[in-house]
Amino acid sequence: MQIFVKTLTGKTITLEVEPSDTIENVKAKIQDKEGIPPDQQRLIFAGKQLEDGRTLSDYNIQKESTLHLVLRLRGGMQIFVKTLTGKTITLEVEPSDTIENVKAKIQDKEGIPPDQQRLIFAGKQLEDGRTLSDYNIQKESTLHLVLRLRGGMQIFVKTLTGKTITLEVEPSDTIENVKAKIQDKEGIPPDQQRLIFAGKQLEDGRTLSDYNIQKESTLHLVLRLRGGMQIFVKTLTGKTITLEVEPSDTIENVKAKIQDKEGIPPDQQRLIFAGKQLEDGRTLSDYNIQKESTLHLVLRLRGGMQIFVKTLTGKTITLEVEPSDTIENVKAKIQDKEGIPPDQQRLIFAGKQLEDGRTLSDYNIQKESTLHLVLRLRGGMQIFVKTLTGKTITLEVEPSDTIENVKAKIQDKEGIPPDQQRLIFAGKQLEDGRTLSDYNIQKESTLHLVLRLRGGMQIFVKTLTGKTITLEVEPSDTIENVKAKIQDKEGIPPDQQRLIFAGKQLEDGRTLSDYNIQKESTLHLVLRLRGGMQIFVKTLTGKTITLEVEPSDTIENVKAKIQDKEGIPPDQQRLIFAGKQLEDGRTLSDYNIQKESTLHLVLRLRGGMQIFVKTLTGKTITLEVEPSDTIENVKAKIQDKEGIPPDQQRLIFAGKQLEDGRTLSDYNIQKESTLHLVLRLRGGMQIFVKTLTGKTITLEVEPSDTIENVKAKIQDKEGIPPDQQRLIFAGKQLEDGRTLSDYNIQKESTLHLVLRLRGGV
């Protein structure tokens, strides 16, 4: 078709184009005709600046449409956009770009629709029709991006006098907006207001939805204490900075003051007091930081990295993080991607539940590590705690509360510091980082509270070489603590240590006093035989069990160990590793299961069923299956019946290709469902997919894969829904129902991935 391009001088150029031509192609055609380099061209249609990677049809540009050509002002510039998760996006813009243009660029980079974006600069929300220069936004300025949530609601604000104020708000209102509404109602200036929710001081720039404040939530209003004070900040170089602060200043405020004095950006600062990393949203008074206290300043390690988070549904999320990110930050990033509130998230790594205030580097989580995400069970319950004096305390808890939370509740009721509490259930000492549900503590269970004996003592540890190590311990130290002390002295990892006393191997969760180990007792240290190893078994409830095994153990042996720990009969256990169901008679080494591998435990559903498999020749095969059978199992049954090797089978249900490691129930395949069997063309191959951000993804495909299959693989890797993906090859947009071979896409071809504009054609 023909289109016209009108320049500012009034000249009109005629171009021959196709709807699938990209803006980049159009600029190349203009360069051919007029000699203007593409990087100096800006094309405008219907008041919108057109982006290089998009096509004419994306913008509904039809035959004889007229585009306007504007030459770029020299003075393109970079700006930064900071999200609530702390991630910073860099954008190439011009002073004349509208806020709408900027939101479109953010959509291209992050996939967030413009109508869900609110941009804030200098405390002001920016309007779509205005330009960056209208707001005096200059190069390297930082905008803040807040996500809009839909729908108004009422909340309550309770003052210290007991008065309750009702406010009309939206989830996307900032705390600053809320304070302005309070000023309208009560006349209290915003800078004298501190708002508290769930024990946390709320920050001006954050929104109600950031804090999970929902309809009819109650905030508490506290007036700021007047009264400044000095504190000191000590850097790693030994330099001490003096700051003027107020007890009500947030850690974020303090970091801003440090930036003013020292030029260190807040996102590179970590502040430590009393051994604890301080969180941005808390105040100095929350941490009991008083006049002339000294904080320690540590610079964040540079070096972003990717980690993976695996959910119980098998979905894997990729996150951009830094080693210095706290677990709380990671949960906020997961909330941004998946919408799961942080208080419903439990993150597990190496079998351990991760605590909010600790950092990734504290847990030695490195690039491409995989965390496991378990959702907290809803549903409060009462438990009882019995003290040695016979007194019984009643506590309101949730199954997902950690032992640490429970000790804090006991401290609230009884005033006993957590570090003096030991909680016992079913004869076992409970560990701080574990949850009530990990120990199967249910409603109306009774825990026993024992106070830790004060008073350290020395014990000796004798190694097989005859060397004797002296340790300072307390009777209430766990065996795990003792192993950590040995690691500090001797460098032997705890998982290679076995401690023996009175002929008995000591268990990690028990204490020295449980074994009657007294001062000057001698323990014997034996190193674990190589070949002995730990593996993890993850259940569908998210619980992780640790087993001591050897590579030569059979799957049958492993099931027996699980029965010992969990009481589940072996014939109800199915173990899955690397997407494969493990057979009883084989060994761990047969499956290349190594130390710290994670197996998945699925309980067998009682009740087989029949399904049908229809081939391209029209033949229908009947199979006996269970909902818990994997697709791999089904292919093996087809091989038994028809002799077709599994690697030549592709199974389709409801238009979707089924993956080997998933089960029939994952795909909601029920009795008498019909699957379709397609034979694979020989010849898997790799192709590349390049995104507009420049990232390249590698995919394993076959020439017979449909474009729909390819989009599903991209979703698995990148989390981008297929309906937001457009794939371009050789300048053409690829259609879902066609195959790679239809488009002559061969091994190592590169496709281009463009995100769909909402409402595009």
From Swiss-Prot:
The keyword Lyase does not apply. There is a cross-link at G76 (Glycyl lysine isopeptide (Gly-Lys) (interchain with K-? in acceptor proteins)). The modification Phosphoserine is found at S65, S141. GO terms for biological process: modification-dependent protein catabolic process; protein ubiquitination. One of its GO terms (molecular function) is protein tag activity. It comes from the Eukaryota. GO terms for cellular component: cytoplasm; mitochondrial outer membrane; nucleus. The modification ADP-ribosylglycine is found at G76. SUPFAM superfamilies: Ubiquitin-like. Keywords: ADP-ribosylation, Cytoplasm, Isopeptide bond, Membrane, Mitochondrion, Mitochondrion outer membrane, Nucleus, Phosphoprotein, Repeat, Ubl conjugation. The record marks R54, R72 as: Interacts with activating enzyme. Transmembrane segments: none annotated. InterPro entries: Ubiquitin-like_dom (IPR000626), Ubiquitin-like_domsf (IPR029071), Ubiquitin_CS (IPR019954), Ubiquitin_dom (IPR019956), Ubiquitin_ubiquitin-like (IPR050158). The record marks H68 as: Essential for function. Residues 1-76, 77-152, 153-228, 229-304, 305-380, 381-456, 457-532, 533-608, 609-684, 685-760 form the Ubiquitin-like domain. The keyword Mitochondrion applies. SMART domains: UBQ (SM00213). There is a cross-link at K6, K11, K27, K29, K33, K48, K63 (Glycyl lysine isopeptide (Lys-Gly) (interchain with G-Cter in ubiquitin)). Residues 761 form a propeptide. Ubiquitin is encoded by 4 different genes. UBA52 and RPS27A genes code for a single copy of ubiquitin fused to the ribosomal proteins eL40 and eS31, respectively. UBB and UBC genes code for a polyubiquitin precursor with exact head to tail repeats, the number of repeats differ between species and strains. Belongs to the ubiquitin family. This is Polyubiquitin-C. It comes from Pan troglodytes. The lineage of its organism: Eukaryota, Metazoa, Chordata, Craniata, Vertebrata.
